[in-house]
Amino acid sequence: MYSFMGGGLFCAWVGTILLVVATATDHWMQYRLSGSFAHQGLWRYCLGNKCFLQTESIAYWNATRAFMILSALCATSGIIMGVLAFAQQSTFTRLSRPFSAGIMFFASTLFVLLALAIYTGVTVSFLGRRFGDWRFSWSYILGWVALLMTFFAGIFYMCAYRMHECRRLSTPR
């Protein structure tokens, strides 16, 4: 059980760090504009060496930002529950901390999937046609890696929960 929780905690830490870095950085998309390279993130866009805040309130950016922030919050609360699961006493039979941590990591996975799906759909259908020579960049890719890490953290914690439940049910009372 503890090895599953340890693996889940490792995946959760890495996934949460990647979520925060992906959300905060400006390299979701790179493109060429007026002969010079440019890149943009969820909060700023940069032309050459100058960066500007994205002040326009565009729905897909707002949705992507919100889902990325929700994902990071769920992953952080999952880490807290996951750490507390190591100290779980047998008196807490109603609320299983490994199960709760797993649910939080799956919620984080869902939110980051929604954020990346929205960003991908709008970028490919609208921005990709507008800029011509463009590509997704490393911040965007970190988001996909974070999705995998939070998903596997959820899997590990659900396996730990299942293993604990099987042991609890098999011991005589």
Swiss-Prot record:
Eye lens specific. Residues 1-3, 88-98, 162-173 are cytoplasmic. Keywords: Disulfide bond, Eye lens protein, Glycoprotein, Membrane, Phosphoprotein, Transmembrane, Transmembrane helix. The modification Phosphoserine is found at residue 170. The modification Phosphothreonine is found at residue 171. Residues 25-66, 120-140 are extracellular. One of its GO terms (cellular component) is plasma membrane. Pfam families: PMP22_Claudin (PF00822). The chain crosses the membrane at residues 4-24, 67-87, 99-119, 141-161. Glycans are attached at residues 43, 61-62. It is found in: Membrane. GO terms for biological process: camera-type eye development; lens development in camera-type eye. One of its GO terms (molecular function) is structural constituent of eye lens. It comes from the Eukaryota. It is a multi-pass membrane protein. Seems to be associated with itself or another lens membrane component via disulfide bonds. Belongs to the PMP-22/EMP/MP20 family. This is Lens fiber membrane intrinsic protein. It comes from Rattus norvegicus.
